[in-house]
């Protein structure tokens, strides 16, 4: 277990409830899904599996459970990031964030910096915090101009289209991928399907399904889902999130959103390492 940066520790039951409330409150709907993993931020990091655990050969039950646990941890992290990007922080979510514990060392410098910024900010909240965060959310992600350079716009199309416009080719591509996996945005989601929150939520859903498949002994389905995740990481997330998170560092002012930028960038690096080991 990694060293923690806060003294607030949640029980296993509380952590599981936090995960359901945080990770499950996003814009995708996928029918019946496995429950979100009951883990906390101290457990999220590189999985450390070797090739024999992830290869085509049949795994032992212990290896399957270890890999399933890694997918559950990944799903938790994707869900947390997705919720932070989806909408402003509300009172309930702020309380959940305050109760969370964060690792002091993950082995990734960007993630470590992100956790330090988040923990520091959450440790000094007051009555003005929600307003401050709402203002910063607008500043960072919505902006005040009419061109494509007034904020870190949270849409893949803005970062991959020549004119930095929304609802371009990237949106059509991810929509097709969502539908291929039986996932669609929920009725109350009004933004484009290539919003960062939905792309992260999609990865959460796939990781949950991979964990479920492993728990059920379906290694072939787990391997297929892992390949879908690797392709989505390579073809979409890696194409724009590094630049997007750098832009967040320009526009965001609070340590919560600055920390979110670093945490996202670092987790993307960890995911690349994970996929190199297991996919």
Question: What feature does the model see in each segment?
Answer:
Residues 2-10, 15-36, 48-279:
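Surface/interface-facing alpha-helical segments and adjacent flexible terminal/loop regions used
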């Amino acid at each position: 277990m990694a060293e923690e940066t806060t003294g607030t520790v949640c029980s296993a039951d509380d952590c599981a409830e936090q995960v359901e409330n945080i990770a499950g409150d996003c814009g995708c709907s996928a029918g019946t899904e496995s429950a979100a993993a009951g883990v906390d931020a101290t457990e999220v990091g590189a999985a450390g599996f070797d090739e024999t655990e992830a290869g085509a050969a049949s795994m032992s039950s212990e290896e399957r459970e270890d890999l399933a646990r890694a997918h559950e941890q990944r799903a938790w992290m994707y869900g947390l990031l997705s919720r932070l990007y989806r909408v402003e922080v509300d009172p309930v979510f702020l309380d959940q964030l305050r109760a969370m514990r964060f690792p002091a060392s993950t082995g990734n410098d960007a993630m470590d910096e992100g956790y330090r910024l988040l923990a520091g900010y959450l440790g000094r909240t007051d009555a003005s915090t929600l307003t401050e965060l709402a203002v910063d959310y607008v500043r960072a992600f919505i902006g005040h101009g009419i061109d494509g350079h007034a904020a870190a716009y949270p849409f893949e199309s803005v970062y991959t289209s020549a004119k930095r416009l929304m609802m371009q080719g990237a949106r059509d591509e991810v929509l097709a991928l969502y539908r291929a996996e039986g996932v669609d945005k929920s009725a109350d989601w009004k933004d484009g399907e290539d919003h960062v929150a939905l792309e992260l939520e999609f990865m959460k859903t796939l990781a949950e399904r991979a964990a479920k498949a492993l728990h059920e002994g379906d290694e072939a389905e787990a391997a297929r889902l892992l390949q879908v995740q690797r392709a989505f990481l390579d073809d979409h997330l890696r194409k724009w999130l590094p630049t997007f998170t750098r832009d967040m560092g320009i526009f965001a002012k609070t340590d919560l959103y600055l920390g979110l930028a670093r945490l996202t960038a670092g987790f993307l690096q960890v995911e690349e390492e994970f996929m190199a080991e297991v996919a």
